[in-house]
Amino acid sequence: MHDWNPALYRRFEDERTRPAHELLARVPLSAASHVVDLGCGPGNSTELLAVRFPGARVTGIDTSAAMLQSARERLPAAEFVQADIAAWAPQPGEAPDLLYANASLQWVGGHESLIPRLFAALAPGGVLAIQMPDNRQEPSHRTMREVAAQAPWRDAIGDAAAVRTRILGIADYYDLLAPIARSVDVWHTVYQHPMASAAAIVEWVSGTGLKPFVDPLPEAQRAGFLAAYERGIDAAYPVRADGQRLLAFPRMFIVARRSA
């Protein structure tokens, strides 16, 4: 998959940052010395951490060089490291008080081992806070798979849906963490985002979920694929009374705290 596009991602920054705010609001820490943003993207969520914990060492982790460059420009006082969450671990003696993963772990596989490993990396009393989109069965994502299965695109796209991991059920995450945590808080929210048009919905998902489908296509095939996808979106999201479309966006939240 090609590198991420920070400018495209930021076009819907308010909508993307809202769940980051709501995740952070449930983090039961009054202070922290070291906080880590796993999958920091362009730094919108990292900025929330820096404001919430002034004076803390703030570290952002991401695989994307473009996203990290954008984050460094936004937050020059923070530390940003290019690394894969699947292999990342804190340095000895640098266990974080907060591991914060907003809309990133859905791109990392092996949650049955990943989640307990991240939790074990926390300092005593530390918190693991996770938010993940739970929208694979929404029309926005079903339509991606349906169009990708059609000729002439299916051979080039292949199994693009496999790039994003199949997340577990919310009760499964509770079961992973409850035996080892002091407390576990889980909840599920479906946001309803008013969107100006079907094209606006396509633009939103082009910055994230649609990338694995579009990137493998030859340049000559991309416009046709996107046009077919937009027709599917137009049919799936009817115009509401004010002329807008409502994009339902389910998200899962997990906040677990270690014993002191």
Curated annotation (Swiss-Prot):
It comes from the Bacteria. It catalyses: trans-aconitate + S-adenosyl-L-methionine = (E)-3-(methoxycarbonyl)pent-2-enedioate + S-adenosyl-L-homocysteine. GO terms for biological process: methylation. Keywords: Cytoplasm, Methyltransferase, S-adenosyl-L-methionine, Transferase. This is Trans-aconitate 2-methyltransferase. GO terms for molecular function: trans-aconitate 2-methyltransferase activity. It holds the Pfam family Methyltransf_25. GO terms for cellular component: cytoplasm. Disulfide bonds: none annotated. InterPro entries: Methyltransf_25, SAM-dependent_MTases_sf, Trans-aconitate_MeTrfase, Trans_acon_MeTrfase_C. Its EC number is 2.1.1.144. The gene is tam. It is an enzyme of class 2 (transferase). Belongs to the methyltransferase superfamily. Tam family. Catalyzes the S-adenosylmethionine monomethyl esterification of trans-aconitate. It is found in: Cytoplasm.
